[in-house]
Design a protein with these regions (language model features):
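Small-side-chain structural scaffolding
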Residues: 44, 60, 70-72
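Aromatic- and Lys/Arg-enriched surface recognition patch
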Residues: 67-140
Length: 154
């Protein structure tokens, strides 16, 4: 996967937005995600500004429901605050909404990016081994989406 990074983007749906609004959107172009009001954690803002690159992978995690509902790619580099959206996701039809989401227990048990110890930031980094594990799990739980997942996950 070259130099691409893998991230988790965490949201709490109780704030009135859920990832299905992205996955079900008819948007043909890139989808603007996140603004200053939405992401307050300094570490998340720094990751987005300095490290998120176009093509990076994002696991979409809903904290209150404790599951990964899908995967998307960044359609832009991360931006600094004050420039509108902090980052754009790929058009929804290029992303994958999992038929069988990965749940916190047991699927994500040993994956640090999802543990409370990793802090409360919206955006967290997923390391190589964790990504390999997540990829295997996704394919195992969603065999009928294997082709789309392989295309997206590489």
């Amino acid at each position: 996967v070259g130099q691409l990074n893998v991230w988790v983007f965490k949201i709490n749906t109780k704030r009135g937005w859920e990832f299905d609004q992205y996955f079900r959107s008819r948007a043909r172009g890139a989808y603007e995600l996140g603004d200053e009001g939405w992401i307050r954690s300094a570490s998340s803002l720094r990751y987005i500004r300095e490290e998120v690159k176009r093509g990076d992978l994002f696991f979409c995690y809903e904290v209150d429901r404790k599951w990964v509902v899908g995967v998307a790619r960044a359609a832009s580099d991360g931006r600094d605050t004050g420039m509108g959206s902090l980052l754009d996701f790929c058009p929804p039809r290029e992303a994958v909404r999992l038929k069988n989401p990965l749940v916190r227990h047991p699927d994500l048990d040993h994956i640090l990016a999802f543990s409370p110890q990793r802090g409360r930031g919206t955006v967290q980094k997923i390391d190589r081994d964790e990504f390999a594990r997540l990829r295997r799990l996704m394919l195992r739980k969603n065999p009928e989406q294997a082709e789309a997942l392989r295309r997206l996950l590489g």
